Amino acid sequence: MKTSHTLGMIAAALVLSACGSAGRGLGGALLSPFDPKPGGYATLNLGGDNGNSIIKKDETIRIHDAEKGGTKSYNANDKFDISHKKQNKITSLGFELLNANKQKVESGELDIYKLSYSAVVGKRIQKRFDGTTGEEIKNFNPYFTVESVQGRFTKEAEKPKSGIVNYQGIAFAGQDNQGRLNYNINFGNNTGSGTITGLKGEFHKQTIELAQADLTKRSSDYYGLSGDAKINGNNRGEYHLNLFGPKADEVA
């Protein structure tokens, strides 16, 4: 049986996120894969372990969210409410990052892409500042990076034992959100592969191949895939994704 889910992606380290309706008629999951809708993953953890945090334990972040009354400060123990933000849509919020001495060290935009059971947070760093003097660093080149991928993991007992699931949706890297991603997971032989097309900039008019990778059990009780990202057969990096949702509804 072949089924379909919707999928979106932040493409810097080629991190993917996807949503669907496993167990409730998978064939209908692609009726509106690009349409924003309410609900979905509700809360971001700002701190965290294993290099998956938005800020470090001694840092403070100021986030500007007009829907929540303007700019507020948060530390690594705080959670950030995104329940009012729409799924299948990139939400961009201005931020300032402060070090342990409360000195501003960078500013830019947080790009949040959320689905039903997961969220991906990217950071467009537009300015950097000296952590001691607070002066802006000249000739700084802005860049985009994926900061955190989090959500409700698919547990071992919940992973499908058979069938091919096709994940489709948006591919984006910062302000470039015109790309399309297509990824298949074969739960019968536990492998996955796909492509990214339509990105601008360095990858304009090129197909990024997400080479076949094995679906394996990660640390405690969740599953993921890691493989090579190629252009014209040449390795250009790696991609990593994990399964999210009670019925392998999403990958991120």
Where are these regions (language model features)?
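Bacterial Sec-dependent N-terminal signal peptides
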Residues: 1-7
